[in-house]
Swiss-Prot record:
Disulfide bonds join 501-518, 512-528. The keyword Disulfide bond applies. One of its GO terms (cellular component) is extracellular region. The gene is xynA. The biological conversion of cellulose to glucose generally requires three types of hydrolytic enzymes: (1) Endoglucanases which cut internal beta-1,4-glucosidic bonds; (2) Exocellobiohydrolases that cut the disaccharide cellobiose from the non-reducing end of the cellulose polymer chain; (3) Beta-1,4-glucosidases which hydrolyze the cellobiose and other short cello-oligosaccharides to glucose. Residues 26-456 are annotated as: Catalytic. It comes from the Eukaryota. The keyword Signal applies. Residues 425-438 have a biased composition (Polar residues). One of its GO terms (biological process) is cellulose catabolic process. It catalyses: Hydrolysis of (1->4)-beta-D-glucosidic linkages in cellulose and cellotetraose, releasing cellobiose from the non-reducing ends of the chains. Belongs to the glycosyl hydrolase 7 (cellulase C) family. This is 1,4-beta-D-glucan cellobiohydrolase xynA.
């Protein structure tokens, strides 16, 4: 995204809980038992057979009540630390405890089978951030290279200014317990968050508190920033409401969690956005921003008044899980029909997949800073996927720029500038106070999470001018995709090994390199195998 685009700015600064439930901690409290709501998800094999996994979710530590060890006195109230209990990073980590959560009563978080619902406003709590668990003390780790990740989402109750997000970050599986002696709570209590903005609003980072240098927010009564930030790679599979959506990878120099200090963090909280070790902007695919304004929304090709399924594929250069990430592909399934990601209509940007050519073209067409490339691009994003990533599901509003980066014109005074139009919401929309008071009953539902080889996690038909052709789930383990104009040829009009050689609407090479054959994978995609 552009240097001015703060689309991820306050993902890590969601409105944080009630006055008593607004912080993270390192020790474990005993006032409320921590019981993780169950959430099942599936692992699929080629051919379409899937196995159900018994998972659960936990609430991020920043939303929880933090109090003194063996006392109910708050360590943190509103947006201010209680320095009578802790006045240094070390003392807070040792003397403050993180307590269990009343998921439905306090936070409006409920699960049923494979479905998770996040309510926006519940009492005095606003928004939430949750993680998928492998067991009671570990986050579920996903390695998605040469795999597809699928989920169903209902965004029908997300108006302008809200973001129901599903994404991955390279957090420690145990939440840092094994690395930091003061961290007793760990993943069980939602400790260890990091992302590509290097958030400094976290109360605890890497076994220490973030109290030293803490500055309360001037426009948010629950948040502030400290001296330290928590950096790691971030893959935004889904940032969306009922108006707009975006798919955005954010690499870092080092994929795993690293701690930064003050303005050296870069990202949202620093005077120099690009001073840090991570890419705060990303290489985004927002159909509306790419000129396809009739694709996503109420009554459009993907109709956001109804649930739909989102399929994302992580293609490698050699077609194996040990290869390097070369493309990210996306399509949708709604009403039994597979819907391809639309191709860009912006001059100078072609195709409908995220690859190096697309990112370079978007950078040039929109006049953006080369942050994505400078931090390793898809290669480093692939390193994060190889390292394993944690699944995050959240609902938030934006105290920075009112979510205009997602669903409106941003910057608001740049109407007509290439890349500024991101959605149809007015530039006056998204003010958090208004959204919270007028749209407090909003919610998002994520369900039917699946992971597996290409074409194993979904089924559907393809619309072909009034008739529908059925595509079975899992008919092959090679990559399925939408129509694409990505560069997978050898430069001589011949598609390279693993490259695309055909499919509905394909205008690229149809002849394969010597030793490979153009093989039909599905109506949208044929591949040189």
């Amino acid at each position: 995204m552009s240097a001015l685009n703060s689309f991820n700015m306050y993902k890590s600064a969601l409105i944080l809980g009630s006055l008593l439930a607004t912080a993270g901690a390192q020790q474990i409290g005993t006032y409320t038992a921590e019981t993780h709501p169950s959430l099942s998800w599936s692992t699929c094999k080629s051919g379409g057979s899937c196995t159900t996994n018994s998972g659960a979710i936990t609430l991020d530590a920043n939303w929880r009540w933090v109090h003194g060890v063996n006392t109910s006195t708050n360590c943190y109230t509103g947006n201010t630390w209680n320095t009578a209990i802790c006045d240094t990073d070390a003392s807070c980590a040792q003397d403050c405890a993180l307590d269990g959560a009343d998921y439905s009563g306090t936070y409006g978080i409920t699960t049923s089978g494979n479905s998770l619902r996040l309510n926006f406003v519940t009492g005095s709590n606003v928004g939430s951030r949750t993680y998928l668990m492998a067991d009671n003390t570990h986050y579920q780790i996903f390695d998605l290279l040469n795999q597809e990740f699928t989920f169903t989402v209902d965004v029908s109750n997300l108006p302008c200014g809200l973001n129901g997000a599903l994404y991955f970050v390279t957090m420690d599986a145990d939440g840092g317990v094994s690395k930091y002696p003061n961290n007793k709570a760990g993943a069980q209590y939602g400790v260890g968050y990091c992302d590509s903005q290097c958030p400094r609003d976290l109360k605890f980072i890497a076994g220490q508190a973030n109290v030293e240098g803490w500055t309360p927010s001037t426009n948010n009564s629950n948040t502030g920033i400290g001296n330290h930030g928590s950096c790691c790679a971030e893959l935004d599979i889904w940032e969306a409401n009922s108006i707009s959506e975006a798919l955005t990878p954010h690499p870092c120099d080092t994929p795993g969690l690293t701690v930064c200090t003050a303005d050296d963090c870069g990202g949202t909280y620093s005077s120099n956005r690009y001073a840090g070790t991570c890419d705060p902007d990303g290489c985004d695919f927002n159909p509306y921003r790419l000129g396809v304004t009739d694709f996503y929304g109420s009554g459009k090709t993907v109709d956001t008044t109804k649930p739909f399924t989102v399929v994302t594929q992580f293609v490698t250069d050699d077609g194996t899980s040990s290869g390097s990430l070369s493309e990210i592909r996306r399509y949708y399934v709604q009403n039994g029909v597979v819907i391809p990601q639309p191709s860009s209509k912006i001059s100078g940007i072609s195709g409908n997949v995220i690859n190096s050519d697309f990112c370079a073209a978007e950078l040039s067409a929109f006049g953006e800073t080369a942050s994505f490339t400078n931090h390793g691009g898809l290669k480093n994003m692939g390193s994060a996927l190889e390292a394993g990533m944690v699944l995050v599901m959240s609902l938030w509003d934006d105290y920075s720029v009112n979510m205009l980066w997602l669903d409106s014109t941003y910057p608001a005074n740049e109407t007509g500038t290439p890349g500024a139009a991101r959605g149809s919401c007015p530039t006056t929309s998204g003010n958090p106070k208004t959204v919270e008071s007028q749209s407090g009953s909003s919610y998002v539902v994520f369900s039917d999470i699946k992971v597996g080889p290409f074409n194993s996690t979904f089924s559907g038909g393809t619309s072909t001018g009034g008739s529908t052709t059925t595509t079975a789930s899992g008919t092959t383990s090679t990559k399925a995709s939408t129509t694409s104009t990505s560069s997978t040829s050898t430069g001589t009009g011949v598609a390279a090994h693993w490259g695309q050689c055909g499919g509905q609407g394909w205008t690229g090479p149809t002849t394969c390199a010597s030793g490979t054959t153009c093989t039909v994978v599905n109506p949208y995609y044929s591949q040189c195998l």
